Amino acid sequence: PLKYYGAHTGRWSGSDKVNFQNLPSRDVKKKALKNAILPPDDHVILNVDSSQIEARILVWLAGQHDQVELYRQGKDVYCDFASRVYKKTINKRNKKERAVGKTCILGLGYGTGHVKLKGVLKLNAGIEVNEIESKRLVKLYREVNHEVVKLWEECDRALRDIASWPADRLPYYLGSGKCLLVEPKGIKLPNGLYITYPDLQLGSDGYEYKSRRGTISIWGGAVVENVVQALARIVIGEQMIEINEKHRPVLTVHDAVVCVSTKATAQDTLDYVMGIMNTAPTWAKDLP
């Protein structure tokens, strides 16, 4: 079972020492557990994923319009960035180069530095780069996604205000889209809930707040990650409510919705679910 609103950002989390969102899927032996989940007789499992939803929301929220347009046109953003890295056209056949592009797009949007990027490339993609190359990748990402960098800075200012709200300051929108409102209480989300940072204060190494796990360090890039995850969770949650009008979702795995359907109605169910998940939310109608 999943725990509703188990994470700080509102995402579901595991419970009873099991997290169905993180079942192994690559290792042949370990993925046997995932493969053991079967539908009833004469039924099928339908898994529909909102592709790259957090990466899409990030550039949309930042107002990085050129990158938003790539998603809107259905372009491969991993290949696009890899083409910039290698100064030549990269496509899906160039698996190693595309993997570098993918790791950068998914890993550098929240302020990751060159040391961590170097480790992630080796761990997730089996690609080793030296320190100079890792620094170049980080620099290139930030040049291409300059509005994302500005969003980190904007969130740093939001932390400062939330920690000590100026007497003459009115609530204000964070990022583009007018879906996030910075208030003394925290950051108000489109569904009316808040991302909060209890007892937020400026420490010797930056801002920090209290949580059930202890004292947590926080900065603009991490705030961006928080709000992007929260917005993605709202998108999926609203889609599940609409899907539930005709078909019952049985599981959500981060950005995916899982339903069970009879074999006879599988295509109709799939078309219905995909239609809903291809529709932008009312509070972000221009989200690709």
Walk through the language-model features, giving the residues of each.
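Acidic, glycine-rich two-metal-ion catalytic cores of nucleic acid-processing enzymes
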Residues: 1-92, 154-256, 263-264, 270-277
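Short, hydrophobic/amphipathic alpha-helical patches that form generic packing surfaces
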Residues: 55-60, 103-110, 143, 226
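Catalytic palm subdomain of template-directed nucleic-acid polymerases
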Residues: 58, 116-129, 141-146, 257-274
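Core structural elements
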Residues: 81, 85, 100-116
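Short, surface-exposed acidic
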Residues: 86-98, 125-138, 285
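Alpha-helical scaffolds flanking conserved acidic
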Residues: 94-104, 247-248
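Polymerase palm active-site segment centered on the conserved acidic dipeptide of motif C
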Residues: 133-164, 264-288
